[in-house]
Each structure stands twice: as structure tokens, then as C-alpha cells.
């Protein structure tokens, strides 16, 4: 947000935010998430923030985050993560069937990392297009809202509608525009 409001890279508040995100990156390249389940959401959020702060897509943390998202892509081209990834004895990402919202988060993260031309992004976009309903929207059975982890999870009915549209629009804009970098609206 600070970058969107015009903060420069040397702004101490922006630097503190970047330093915090870099310090919180997990060894596997992911970030923990809070409002969405879980590491897919957190990794998208962190990559969007680092991109917004002006870090180069070749920065090691951004590359590790993008590599992690690519590594956890489901064979069908989408992404999914089970709520059990919030368990206390964390052992790693918990895969689940692909969902529209988690696929969109992964795509938004990869695009923020400068990976719009990566084949994983194409596969994810194709998954969203193939699973889009006749009304132009998506449904999903799995909970993807964080709620209070390990206590209850939320089914935000807007998640599988808003986020896929955002990801597809961003993909189209990056592929047809003059820039491969996400510059506005994180």
C-alpha cells in the first residue's frame, strides 16, 4: 500500500515492511497466510507486496516464492491447499483438489513475481477457463477462508468469483500490454 501511495524504496516504513516479509519467508520459499488458506494465499500476498515495493523479480526471495508455487501446482493445472496445513506440528504444505480461489491466488502471485510467461501460469489460466460455469463464475466445495485456524474455517462465497476474475484480467492485461510487471493494484 505504501508503494501505491508513492513511498520510495528508501522510505523507512517501506523498508521495514520488506524486511519483515523477507524474514518471515519459510525455508521452502512459501509464506504463511492468514485470511485465506494458507501458504498459497500467504505466498501470493508476500509476492504482491514485494513487487509493489519495487523488488526485482530476480530477487532470491521472489524467485524462491515463485518456485514454491510452481512446485505445488496440481497435475490438473490448478492449485489447492487443505486447511490441515494450519496444524500445530507443521510438516509442510498440505495438497488438496484445485479450487478457483487458490488457483487465482497462485496465478496472482506468479504474475507479481514476473512469471506471466511461465507454462505453469498458462496451465492455471487454462484450468480456470475449463472450470468456469455457464454463468461465467466458479463454484468450490472446499473452505478457503482462514477463519480461526484449527478452530473453524470460512466459506467466503465471493472468493471463487472475485479472485479468478481478477487473475484472468491481470493475465490478459499483462499479455497484451507493454509491461510484464504488475505495476498497479498489486
Language-model region placement:
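An alpha-helical repeat/solenoid feature that recognizes helix-turn-helix modules
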Residues: 1-19, 23-179, 184-186
Amino acid at each position: 500500500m505504501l508503494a501505491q501511495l508513492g513511498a520510495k524504496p528508501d522510505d523507512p516504513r517501506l523498508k521495514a515492511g520488506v524486511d519483515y516479509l523477507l524474514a518471515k519467508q519459510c525455508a521452502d520459499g512459501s509464506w504463511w497466510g492468514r485470511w485465506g488458506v494458507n501458504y498459497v494465499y500467504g505466498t501470493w500476498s508476500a509476492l504482491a507486496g514485494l513487487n509493489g515495493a519495487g523488488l526485482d523479480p530476480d530477487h532470491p526471495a521472489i524467485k524462491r516464492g515463485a518456485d514454491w508455487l510452481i512446485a505445488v501446482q496440481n497435475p490438473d493445472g490448478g492449485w489447492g491447499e487443505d486447511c490441515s496445513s494450519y496444524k500445530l506440528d507443521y510438516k509442510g504444505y498440505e495438497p488438496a483438489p484445485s479450487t478457483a480461489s487458490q488457483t487465482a491466488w497462485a496465478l496472482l502471485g506468479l504474475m507479481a513475481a514476473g512469471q506471466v510467461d511461465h507454462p505453469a501460469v498458462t496451465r492455471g489460466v487454462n484450468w480456470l477457463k475449463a472450470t468456469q460455469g455457464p454463468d461465467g463464475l466458479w463454484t468450490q466445495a472446499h473452505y478457503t477462508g482462514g477463519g480461526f485456524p484449527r478452530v473453524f474455517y470460512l466459506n467466503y462465497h465471493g472468493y471463487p468469483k472475485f479472485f479468478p476474475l481478477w487473475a484472468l484480467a491481470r493475465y490478459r492485461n499483462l499479455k497484451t500490454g507493454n509491461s510484464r510487471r504488475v505495476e498497479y493494484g498489486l
